[in-house]
């Protein structure tokens, strides 16, 4: 499945992609270049899988304290629909910046890999699936999507719900567009910046 294999690499600036891929190929055989560092970041599955799975299983996480199988017990069809909806939003944002759109089912990828069946859930809500993947994953992605005019109602909802569960403002965490140096860029300026630096 393309989301897991091969390892995707984005280069900043993208105009140096061939040079970087050539240098890395001997160390990481089978790597795949993507259009930009943003497209690479938006293709990360951790926030797409962890955040909806953890938010929809928060009660189970608190009760079981890690004694349940996250990817089998926690990933029913309704959870998978939310994963796919959020994945779609990140794909549309990546496509808007010039990246490829993934069409693979995340649930099928998880079900098709026996290694996922062994993984137990987080033991509490202080786990990195919440504390990192919400503010540094989907909250930052949603900010980027807003910058280029892409709505992210699913991501925004999950950031809000995560804030309630964690008793914090998850939307204020993560990276701001100002910290990334792209706050005042329109879509064309952002595309040019990603290619040329």
Place the predicted regions along the sequence by residue.
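Inter-helical turn/loop segments and adjacent helix faces that build the functional surface
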Residues: 28, 73, 77, 145-148
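C-terminal substrate-binding/catalytic lobe of Rossmann-fold NAD(P)-dependent dehydrogenases
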Residues: 41-135, 139
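Serine/threonine-rich low-complexity intrinsically disordered regions
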Residues: 13-16, 102, 176
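Long, low-complexity C-terminal extensions of enzymes
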Residues: 96-100, 107-195
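Rossmann-fold dinucleotide-binding core
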Residues: 1-67
């Amino acid at each position: 499945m393309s989301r897991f294999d091969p390892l995707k690499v984005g280069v900043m600036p993208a105009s140096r992609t061939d040079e970087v891929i050539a240098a890395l190929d001997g160390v990481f055989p089978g790597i795949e270049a993507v259009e930009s560092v943003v497209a690479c970041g938006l293709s990360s599955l951790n926030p797409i899988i962890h955040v909806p799975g953890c938010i929809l299983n928060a009660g189970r996480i608190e009760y079981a304290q890690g004694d349940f199988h996250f990817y089998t017990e926690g990933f029913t069809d309704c959870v998978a629909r939310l994963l796919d909806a959020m994945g779609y939003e990140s794909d549309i944002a990546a496509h808007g910046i010039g990246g490829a759109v993934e069409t693979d089912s995340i649930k099928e990828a998880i079900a098709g890999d026996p290694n996922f069946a062994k993984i137990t859930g987080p033991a509490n809500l202080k786990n990195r699936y919440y504390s990192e993947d919400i503010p540094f994953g989907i909250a930052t992605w949603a900010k980027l999507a807003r910058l280029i005019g892409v709505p992210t109602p699913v991501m925004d909802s999950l950031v809000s719900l995560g804030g309630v569960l964690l008793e914090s403002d998850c939307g204020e965490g993560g990276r701001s567009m100002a910290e990334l140096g792209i706050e005042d860029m329109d879509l064309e300026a952002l595309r040019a910046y990603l290619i040329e630096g």
